[in-house]
């Protein structure tokens, strides 16, 4: 089986770095939590902005953590690296004897670097194993979901997390195909989806596989779970004048985070069925 070569590692350019620096004001000094360290772009910007800032840098991707350690080596005495999930913030802060910090940042979703690593299986544009785990110490992969869930379960995942109107058609195609042979690569899955949802560049602005890949990635990594609790925990551990910044990419996480902010501000009743969002 031949997989495509991953995209070369380039200097990571953090998203909205100027806006984040203006909002979080690292020049105030003290502790910042970077809950999604990635390759360390935001953390590097914080550390360069102020010699008195320290960063608790969390990420569940061990490969990204290793690269970030190299990048941030000049600042090693001001960074604590943690392999973990930002949603476990309360526990992580206790472990490191921190009670309150002046700023917390999380940048949700998959990074461009992760998408460019064929062996991680996040992208339909690079052929690789159908993995999609952000934390490779976890056991469930996208291939396992694709090859074991029922047609109804697959359709629900693709519809709920990918907002894909053709979810049932795609799920049936997957189930029918896996009877013949397991679906193990990103290329296999992408082609199945494209056959289920005919693709014409004139009709579609995005590849038909986009929503299905997003849905499976969210399911594998349980990305939308406990985001509301994270917001509560984060605010509880901010100093009185502290700030929480959350960068969202797609509408599902955006709605959840905005609602959690409204609840914390007393603008909305927290007792709401998440499926109605």
Residue spans for each PLM region:
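S-adenosyl-L-methionine-dependent methyltransferase catalytic core, i.e., the SAM/SAH-binding region
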Residues: 1-277
